[in-house]
Amino acid sequence: YQQLYPDFYVEGPAPALENRENTMYLTFDDGPSDLTSEFLQVLEEKDVKATFFVVGKTDETSKERYRQIVAAGHTLGMHSYSHDYKKIYQSVESFLDDYYQLFTLLKEETGVKTSVFRFPGGSINSYNMGVYQEIIAEMVRRGFRFFDWSLSAEDAAKRSPTAAAICDGILTRAEGRSRGIVLMHDSYHCKTTLEALPRLIDGLREKG
């Protein structure tokens, strides 16, 4: 598999999401969605940059949203093309097939060769136990860097928590932490995440 996709690599340092003290990094998985533009608007109003770990969508509206994310100065990351756990975790080759498809789509639509990625389900999950170490080694060899998360909005389920629950949950778990990576979802059902975002940003800033 090291011979597969010779143009599927990046050079130079990947963004370091966890090295700065007193910094909480905001990340959004599974977009773009009907809410992407609204998330971007809140982030602009609060003067905050985020990382969007996106999936593969080829409709024109989604392509435009990829471009909006980049134009607004945010980091575009890969979260797999298909988000199909059984498919992508079959083998290293299957993983590369899927992520190369997304890498190529994002490069064509935005001009960006994204260097960061996130595993669906996290880097170690019940679907990839036999293959995750090989996947990580191969992706790192190609210059990519993956990021899990340390704080979650718990908003992946179709029935999302209330905005207050999202905000209070993250702020409570952030107590005593000098840094962290916050997981949220940019999905059509995550209206309460959008509602929570302004207060969450203010609350994290108050904590320093």
Please identify what each model-predicted range represents:
Residues 60, 83-205:
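Catalytic domains of cell-wall/extracellular-matrix polysaccharide-remodeling enzymes
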Residues 19-21, 46, 72, 113, ...:
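Residue-level preference for short coil/turn positions at secondary-structure junctions
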Residues 25-26, 44, 48-56, 70, ...:
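Short, well-structured secondary-structure segments
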Residues 29, 79, 120:
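Active-site glycine-centered loops adjacent to acidic/histidine catalytic or metal-binding residues
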Residues 27, 36, 51, 80, ...:
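Ser/Thr-centric signal marking residues that sit
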Residues 23-25, 50, 178-184:
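Generic beta-sheet signal
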